[in-house]
Amino acid sequence: MNRFILSLMIMAGGAFASSADNLVLLTTNDTHSAIDIGADGVGGVLPRKAIIDSVRKAEKNVLLIDAGDVVQGSLYFKYFNGDVEYPVANMMNYDIRILGNHEFDNGLDELAKYWKNVKADRLSANYDFKGTVADGIFEPYVIKKIGKKKIGFIGINVDPHSLIIQGNYEGMKYSDAIATANKVASMLRKQKKCDLIVAVTHIGYEAIPGKASDVDLARQSKDIDIIVGGHSHTYVDPATPEKTPYWISNADGKPVLVTQTGKYGRNLGYINIDLDALDKVKDGKRAFEYMYIPVTDRFSPEAYDKDIIEFLVPYKHAVDSVNSKVIGWSMQDMQNNDHAGTYANWVADFAMNTGSDIADELRKSDPSFPNIDMSFMNVGGIRQPMKQGAVTEGQILSTFPFSNRFEIIEIKGKDIIDALKIAAIKGGECVSENITVVSDDAGNLQHVYINGKEMDPEKTYTVATIDYIAQGNDDYVTMANNRSLWQSKEELSQYILNYIRNLTAEGIPLSANPNRRFVTNISKYIDK
């Protein structure tokens, strides 16, 4: 069944071939507070719920699963801290949920407050919360009986080190994702006699070297049949298996289905499992049908959940009022998911300009305060794209939702270079236009140039950044080897808002320098 036919069936009210011998898994991941339907008519909790209701009406055995990061990324979380996302998820009647890293953004106390009220099986096999406020909330696995079959589900979470701010998970103990998943899966298979085992993960389809990923888990497993993944925002689209393979051979050569639906609730994952053919393998595939259901506003208003509509009214009014405040104008589209693209450049150049202005101001009272040599920001902090046209206050607050502080640090060149090695593997990062990072085709760093000269590993540089990076997070561990010179009291987003307002007051629209800072062509950057 292709997804076009599936979509037509959903719109028609669900004319599926329902069977007691089948199990349907509907999956989401990384919805990131995307409550409203997008400007392009895609996403939104109301169309998602309408699709879920249609499938549940048509199929006898349906389980709704979320692979983490329900929160963070829009004004709904910025202003209401989970008061919207968690109740809405409960109204959708999820069966199984796991944590993402952004569930920790407001600390363990807030996490525990909301997750105690989650109406679903709450799974985490490799986070130990004993002795913390979250103790007793999560179980490592759950077994669902579907007909005569036992289906085991395991929750596997991401390594928090250099990803989650340390104080936000203080007291929690992490265990290796792959080792834990395999241990629990083996127990479920051998002791609990499960017929099918599903790992629900928030570790990413792929990861940097040294970090576990879904592909690694699939390859190193023996007892896991399906991985429902999240974290990397990867579109593991069954329509394009050449880009992101979704059948991965395990340690015994048996195919494992690896899935992920991208981000922002733009798709629902749909996995139809033939429970009478669980051991059948043909052409490197199992008896699991996997596809995307696009979440679009194709439904009539009557199909939308009235309780959710009523619940959202006061929150939506507050969000819409901020989203309507125009503060500037952008000359171009800027994508937030391009590590070496225009939005990354714009953010880095904003940081360089603002950091230099701050340094100039500080020198009035301290003439010895150094000039800013470069900026180093993170693409992960840019949560939304920017479209050509009007720029609103709400758009900026949604794009930069974190409570990061602007910071100026001193740090050795060798520590910057080591961090840029990681950035190169990721495909790029937000660095100022006076920086050129040269790598080979595999992403291995070869040279770092600053103002056209090779960066000196032993020299101390002054860098404009954010506290999150300065603490060694986002895998940039060596950036923590710094001396802080100054940190803002206001959040980064306020500096960006003021920067845009000042540009607008001068009649200057937003535009980004398109020149790439991460390159593979070495010849033009050799010192003259």
Model-derived segments and spans:
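Sec-dependent signal peptide recognition
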Residues: 1-8
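Hydrophobic h-region of N-terminal signal peptides that target proteins for export
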Residues: 9-18
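Active-site-adjacent helix-turn-beta-strand microarchitecture at beta-sheet edges
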Residues: 22-36, 63, 71-175, 209-322, ...
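Feature captures C-terminal
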Residues: 22-24, 34-43, 47, 119-126, ...
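Short catalytic helix/loop segments, enriched in acidic residues and glycine
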Residues: 40-54, 174-181
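Active-site metal-binding motif and surrounding structural segment of the metallo-beta-lactamase
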Residues: 47-67, 95, 189
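Short beta-strand/loop segments at the ligand-binding rim of alpha/beta enzyme cores
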Residues: 61-65, 193-200
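Hard-cation-handling environments
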Residues: 282-391
